[in-house]
Swiss-Prot record:
Belongs to the anthranilate phosphoribosyltransferase family. Gene3D superfamilies: Nucleoside phosphorylase/phosphoribosyltransferase catalytic domain, Transferase, Pyrimidine Nucleoside Phosphorylase, Chain C. It comes from the Archaea. Binds 2 magnesium ions per monomer. PANTHER family: ANTHRANILATE PHOSPHORIBOSYLTRANSFERASE (PTHR43285:SF2). This is Anthranilate phosphoribosyltransferase. Anthranilate 1 binds at residues 80, 111. InterPro entries: Anthranilate_Pribosyl_Tfrase, Glycosyl_Trfase_fam3, Glycosyl_Trfase_fam3_N_dom, Glycosyl_Trfase_fam3_N_dom_sf, Nuc_phospho_transferase. Pathway: Amino-acid biosynthesis; L-tryptophan biosynthesis; L-tryptophan from chorismate: step 2/5.
Length: 333
């Protein structure tokens, strides 16, 4: 299909189907489109609102361009769209560590923070993890240690083509939605946090279209995490269908506590580590409620209440922090 025809379609406020979005995305990443055309297409989708079909098409394209991690075991991911501006510590990464310590296999895919203070890669780098590990090594770490972190720019090098345009646009684009769904290990089980409520529908439908076995999409009262301060809206995707419900900390057996926030990278690292060691109550609880959903998605527990109990005990027993240190040391060898 003619790329210019797709651009005209977007210019008239029309949405693309998944195949058309795939073609457009390929045109962007291969350099076929100019920077002006890329900016126009990303802006048109943003103004209208990206659809689930468009996201699914872009994810399919991103997966084809990715450096593949050859997983030999079934793994999960925990990822968020970011952009909530809440200043919380990196809960999804800490929750992934806890889930791994409690028996899940985790291939955590992430990046540095693009708009906020602290991304998952910033945290992993700060604790000494080697961000340069290759795909075969990552697969072995998932199998042997139960956890590996893969740095998005290393596994999605084609995204560098669109980076200059994205940096100049004063808003987040479809690529911010695609990233969390484009795990290079092609995981089929995932916890996904969204910063905007409209993305609950978009991402859950996209996950269903992409054939996820079990995905849970969450928005926690303004943050792209499961919140400990109030209600979290949950869209649970299984067998191509999504179920919507809300959940509060008490439903998991957890108390309501303030989300752990930080005003610097150093403070964010310190609070996350204290939470993983069980030394900062609010951080430990916030990490555990997110890990509860990760363990549920992984099939380690039958429900999130059991997941929270397992997660908080894993933290209290010191296993979560030990798993982080094991992952860090294993990434260097």
């Amino acid at each position: 299909m003619d790329l210019r025809a797709l651009l005209r379609k977007l210019g008239h406020g029309q949405s693309l189907n998944a195949d058309e979005a795939y073609i457009l995305g390929k045109g962007i990443l291969t350099g076929t489109l100019s920077e002006v055309e890329i900016a126009a297409s990303l802006t048109a989708m943003k103004v209208r609102g990206e659809t689930a079909e468009e996201v699914a098409g872009f994810v399919k394209m991103a997966r084809e361009f990715a450096v593949r991690v050859p997983l030999t075991v079934e793994a999960i991911d925990t990822a968020g769209t970011g952009g909530d501006g809440a200043g919380t510590i990196n809960l999804s990464t800490a929750a992934a560590i806890v889930a791994a310590a409690a028996g899940a296999k985790v291939l955590k895919h992430g990046n540095r923070s693009a708009s906020g203070m602290f991304g998952s890669a910033d945290f992993m780098e700060a604790v000494g993890y080697n961000l340069e590990i290759g795909p075969e090594r990552a697969a072995r770490l998932v199998e042997e240690v139960g956890f590996a972190f893969v740095f998005a720019p290393k596994y999605h090098p084609a995204f560098a083509r669109v980076a200059p345009v994205r940096r100049q646009l004063p808003f987040r684009t479809v690529f911010n939605i695609v990233g969390p769904l484009a795990n290079p290990g092609l995981v089929k089980r995932q916890l996904i946090g969204v910063a905007e409520t409209r993305l609950l529908d978009v991402i859950s439908e996209a996950a269903a279209r992409l054939g996820f076995e079990h995905a849970v999409v969450v928005h926690g009262s303004g943050v792209d995490e499961v919140t400990t301060e109030g209600e979290t809206v949950v869209y649970e995707v299984r067998k191509g269908a999504a179920e919507r419900y809300t959940i509060s900390p008490g439903d998991l057996g957890a108390p309501r506590v303030p989300l752990p926030r930080a005003s610097s990278k150093e403070e964010a690292v310190a609070k996350a580590l204290a939470g993983l060691r069980g030394e900062l109550l609010e951080a430990s609880i916030a990490i555990a409620v997110n890990a509860a959903f990760a363990l549920y998605v992984a099939g380690v527990v039958k429900d999130v209440k059991d997941g929270y109990e397992l997660a908080i005990n894993t933290i209290r027993e010191g296993a979560a922090y030990r798993k982080l240190m094991e992952a860090v040391e294993s990434s260097k060898t």
